[in-house]
């Protein structure tokens, strides 16, 4: 079984549509688990009709995804941002990749939006990921449960949890880099400026690779999880 784990925090505006898009996968046997980090806008209530389980999880993306994985029944796990849409046959593609011997992988990403640079940025993200074996959350990382447990799950850090997880998984095996596209929202790129966002993300990533603490990077990014 494929378990799709969706961490949420104040996603009321789009969560129903995001989860409704997963209905065909659920009809084919996948389960959807929403791990909510204490939304104040009713996200958890809106998610209830569209998921097998809606969990109240400790706030923080890594904590929420680990909580979802602990509750999941599947032998394959897929971690999906609430603002990212999977390919229609994602369940079959993941199953085929794991059946071929992959231990983990990710999809190519497309960035939805009107800015002409977004397709180029997505293409470079996919190329970089294919060359380095590192995936980001926007690429809908999937993993066999045994590999998830062998890697130790997500580290309890407020930012770069996807990069850290990929690095540990890469020690087990190279990822299956699927060319089918997960489509992620370009809202943060367009809201803050495409070039500015690219430069900020690369600066944060370089600092992380050179040892900067993730909590400091989270503050620079403008993200600091509130305590529950």
Q: Can you describe what each PLM-predicted range is?
A:
Residues 77:
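Short aromatic/hydrophobic "clamp" motif used to bind/position activated sugar donors
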Residues 88-117:
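Conserved donor NDP-sugar-binding/catalytic core segment of glycosyltransferases
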Residues 30-33, 44-71:
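Conserved donor nucleotide-binding strand/loop of the catalytic core
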Residues 167-228:
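Hydrophobic helical membrane-anchoring modules
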Residues 1-3, 31, 164:
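Cell-envelope/extracellular polymer assembly enzymes that use nucleotide-activated donors
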Residues 21, 36-44, 84:
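A conserved acidic beta->alpha catalytic loop
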Residues 13-17, 39-50:
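Acidic helix N-cap motif at the loop->helix transition within catalytic regions
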Residues 20-29:
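Short, acidic, metal-binding catalytic loop of nucleotide-sugar glycosyltransferases
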